[in-house]
């Protein structure tokens, strides 16, 4: 599972600046949940091929009466859920009582913690850091987050070694890691091959489909989970997954195996109403990372919120297949239903490839139809398409709509091949293809989707240009060119 790093510290010590600095390595703030956690932001970053989730917690204060009393519950939860904690202090302001209170709390938590002294630009670092060694947290990493100084050393010396160990340890886990190992092997296989392979050692359709049921609190995720399990009347048992938070529940339907990833935990149907469904952003993000298909549950009576759109954006950025379930559809008037459909068309137009189902998890109406779309999305995401087929589709798209001129020259697209699966990746080779405008790239993506009939999964297109073999070579004259040049020079001398 993807490791989690929490940034903690007093207010205004530069946590958000470091958060932006780290997430900009991926050039995106992947998940921000406004209104849900006012003092926390979530980002997904990639450094040297290692991915991790970063939490920017709110400032912790109130050391006068003890940090346990005044530390925000969200920040406490972030520390508990994190694998690595970066404790930021202000080197300019010096050691403060709140810093000592936070350090005391962190020493009592069994988490790998690094002390990071920010705002060290323009000051004597050794003098400024002397007092902070009394916190008893070991080595101090001086940085200037606003300018990026020291951040690379922090990444190389602190984060990458721990993240690497975390990933290796997870590979030694059992049960669920067998499926994860398959997908890792499949991705490595896809990077090495640029031509279609006739022989496939792995058939994705024989593996269980990992299905993550995600959504805001109280939209009916657990009710839907229990309904999907109860319909099949199978023996359900809890299978602890690779994380502390998610429960993996195997089930079977129509001869096909599934693994439901329940972020809220499994509860008996009779107790669902008695328990307040808790929402953990970290659980949800990790479930999305680990699944093949994400089932996003939306409350029809509350409409689409910013949290729904944030989750949707994270699913798309992660390249996961998507099915949307609009729950609590029962009991609504026809007029209200039409309004909900109009709102969905307006706000979800950018994910028109995803199937939308109107269901009632409580009564079971429409739930059975979800599996057809889940299977369709998974099949489209893992389907093999040959180079000849992709190249033919590319030529058809080019014939229907010629690419624009770039610096007075026509872009030449030579051939296309599969660059990966889950999500499907199409790699197009040619001249100046990377300079194509975004509008034409969207046209190509939609053309491939329409022709291949890809539903339920995003499709990505990558462009590669061939290098000019003569770019670094001097022009060498042929023998005839040399003789011609000599005659020309002799003629010029005579004319003078």
UniProtKB/Swiss-Prot annotation:
Positions binding GTP 2 in this chain are 215-222, 262-266, 327-330
Keyword list (alphabetical) reads:
GTP-binding, Nucleotide-binding, Repeat, Ribosome biogenesis
CDD domains to which the protein is assigned, alphabetical? EngA1, EngA2
Annotated GTP 1 binding lies at 9-16, 56-60, 118-121
Q: Name the Gene Ontology molecular function terms of this record.
A: GTP binding; ribosome binding
Residue stretches making up the EngA-type G domain: 3-166, 209-382
Record domain KH-like: where? 383-467
Segments crossing the lipid bilayer: none
Is Nucleotide-binding included in the keywords of this UniProt record?
A: yes
Q: Which GO terms describe its biological process?
A: ribosome biogenesis
- PANTHER family per record: GTPASE DER
Which protein family is it in?
Answer: Belongs to the TRAFAC class TrmE-Era-EngA-EngB-Septin-like GTPase superfamily. EngA (Der) GTPase family.
Assembly, per entry: Associates with the 50S ribosomal subunit.
Q: What does this protein do?
A: GTPase that plays an essential role in the late steps of ribosome biogenesis.
Q: What is the official name of this protein in its record? A: GTPase Der
């Amino acid at each position: 599972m993807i490791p989690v790093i929490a940034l903690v510290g007093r207010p205004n010590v530069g946590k958000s600046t470091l958060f932006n600095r780290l997430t900009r390595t991926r050039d995106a703030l992947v998940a921000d949940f406004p209104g849900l956690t006012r003092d926390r932001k979530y980002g997904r970053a990639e450094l040297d091929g290692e991915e991790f989730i970063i939490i920017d917690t709110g400032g912790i204060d109130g050391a006068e009466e003890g940090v346990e009393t005044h530390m925000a519950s969200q920040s406490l939860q972030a520390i508990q859920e994190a694998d690595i904690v970066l404790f930021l202090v202000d080197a300019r302001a010096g050691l403060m009582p709140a810093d000592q209170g936070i350090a005391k709390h962190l020493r009592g938590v069994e988490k790998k913690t690094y002390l990071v002294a920010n705002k060290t630009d323009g000051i004597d670092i050794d003098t400024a850091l002397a007092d902070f060694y009394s916190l008893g947290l070991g080595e101090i990493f001086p940085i200037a987050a606003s300018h990026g100084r020291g951040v690379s050393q922090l990444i190389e010396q602190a984060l990458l070694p721990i993240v690497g160990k975390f990933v290796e340890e997870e590979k030694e886990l059992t049960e669920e890691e067998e499926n994860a190992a398959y997908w890792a092997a499949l991705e490595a296989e896809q990077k090495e091959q640029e031509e279609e392979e006739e022989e496939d050692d792995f058939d994705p359709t024989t593996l269980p489909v990992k299905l993550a049921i995600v959504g805001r609190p109280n939209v009916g995720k657990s009710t839907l989970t229990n309904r999907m399990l109860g319909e099949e009347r199978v023996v359900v048992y809890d299978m602890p997954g690779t994380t502390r938070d998610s429960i993996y529940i195997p089930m079977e339907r129509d001869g096909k195996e599934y693994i439901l990833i329940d972020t809220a935990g499994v509860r008996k149907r009779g107790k669902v109403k008695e328990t307040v469904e808790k929402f953990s952003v970290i659980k949800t993000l990790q479930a999305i990372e680990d699944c093949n298909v994400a089932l996003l549950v939306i409350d029809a009576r509350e409409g689409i919120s910013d949290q729904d759109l944030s989750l949707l954006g994270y699913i798309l950025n992660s390249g996961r297949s998507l099915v949307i379930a609009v729950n609590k559809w029962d009991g609504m008037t026809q007029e209200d239903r039409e309004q909900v459909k109009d709102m969905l068309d307006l706000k979800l137009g950018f994910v028109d490839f995803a199937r939308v189902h109107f269901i009632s998890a409580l009564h079971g109406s429409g739930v059975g139809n979800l599996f057809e779309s889940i299977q369709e999305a998974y099949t489209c995401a893992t389907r093999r398409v040959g180079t000849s087929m992709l190249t033919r589709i590319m030529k058809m798209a080019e014939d229907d709509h010629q690419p624009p001129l770039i610096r007075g020259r026509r872009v030449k697209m030579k051939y296309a091949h599969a660059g990966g699966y889950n999500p499907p990746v199409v790699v197009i080779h040619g001249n100046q293809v990377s300079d194509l405008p975004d509008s034409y790239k969207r046209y190509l993506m939609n053309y491939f989707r329409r022709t291949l009939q890809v539903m339920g999964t995003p499709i990505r297109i990558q462009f590669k240009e061939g290098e000019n073999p003569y770019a670094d070579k001097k022009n060498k004259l042929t023998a005839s060119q040399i003789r011609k040049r000599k005659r020309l020079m002799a003629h010029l001398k005579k004319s003078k």
